[in-house]
């Protein structure tokens, strides 16, 4: 039996990123594989005709490459942390239907997937929690979720496409709270400069009726802008299109590599990594 998804619902907003990850898997098989996305889309009853039509456009295909690189970069950082903290908590902030935690599973870590209650309800149906895994309904801005994470063996948190929808002050409060609660932990997420955030915001600000885009979280120089938030933070960043992979694969055109450089350098599309130092 297929799970029906209606148009203009919260569930629909989760299906489209899933479709992007399936498209990445088809277009760039040497760079990215998301078998979960392919499998889940087979279980869903939804009219993909518009998405399929758009998938042939140049920018849609480049957007799929962006999604692939972002997921790969975040997975790289999670796996790097697990090498030195094999029993750590792996925490997917704003998980949607993303299965990166399970993809990084080393057989010993604990996996937590956090999102709003209606999202977690759908996730439980399509991606029920497995061994050493919990799907936790919460509001990321409310620190009540901190207590649900067993960080005894360390903790690595990652957020994909999440903080563009947070005010700068909200990200700052979250990071400071996490530094208190999870000393020795690491947070990795994607970010971009003000120009890029304005472009992202164009699509959703109209519906949200928000005037002040400038209040939303954007970063150009992560180390100099975020380090002053708290003396315990160890901040670094890498370009998210070319910072982890040179994209010299036959599936990626020279024009797309050029766009990738524009993204990393002009839009400051980056993966930010924040280490939480020990309590002072």
Give, region by region, the residue ranges found by the protein language model.
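Short, glycine-/aromatic-enriched active-site segment of Class I SAM-dependent methyltransferases
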Residues: 198-213
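Conserved beta-strand signature within the Rossmann-like core of class I S-adenosyl-L-methionine
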Residues: 181-194
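Short alpha-helix
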Residues: 213-240
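Rossmann-like AdoMet
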Residues: 1-91, 95-138, 151-152
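A conserved beta-strand element that flanks and buttresses the S-adenosyl-L-methionine
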Residues: 157-158
């Amino acid at each position: 039996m297929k799970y029906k998804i209606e148009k203009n619902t919260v569930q629909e907003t989760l299906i489209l990123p899933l479709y992007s990850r399936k498209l990445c898997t088809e277009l760039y098989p040497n760079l990215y594989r998301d078998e979960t996305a392919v499998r889940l889309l087979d279980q869903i009853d939804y009219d993909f005709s518009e998405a399929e039509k758009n998938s042939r456009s140049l920018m849609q295909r480049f957007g799929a490459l962006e999604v692939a690189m972002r997921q790969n970069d975040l997975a790289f950082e999670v796996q790097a942390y697990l090498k030195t903290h094999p029993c750590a908590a792996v925490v997917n902030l704003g998980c949607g239907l993303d299965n990166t935690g399970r993809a990084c599973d080393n057989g010993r870590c604990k996996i937590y997937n956090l999102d709003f209650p209606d999202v977690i309800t759908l996730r439980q149906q399509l991606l029920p929690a497995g061994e050493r895994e919990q799907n936790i309904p919460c509001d990321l801005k409310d620190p009540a979720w901190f207590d649900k994470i067993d960080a005894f063996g360390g903790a690595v948190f990652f957020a994909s496409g999440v903080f563009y929808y947070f005010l700068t002050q909200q990200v700052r409060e979250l990071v400071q709270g996490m530094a208190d609660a999870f000393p020795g932990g690491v947070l990795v997420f994607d970010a971009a400069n003000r120009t890029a955030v304005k472009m992202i915001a164009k699509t959703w600000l109209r519906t949200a009726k928000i005037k002040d885009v400038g209040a939303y979280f954007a970063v150009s120089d992560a180390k100099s802008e975020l380090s002053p938030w708290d003396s315990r933070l160890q901040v670094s960043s890498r370009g998210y299109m070319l910072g982890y992979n040179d994209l010299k694969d036959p599936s990626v055109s020279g024009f797309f590599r050029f766009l990738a450089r524009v993204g990393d350098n002009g839009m400051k599309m980056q993966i930010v990594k924040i280490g939480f130092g020990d309590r002072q």
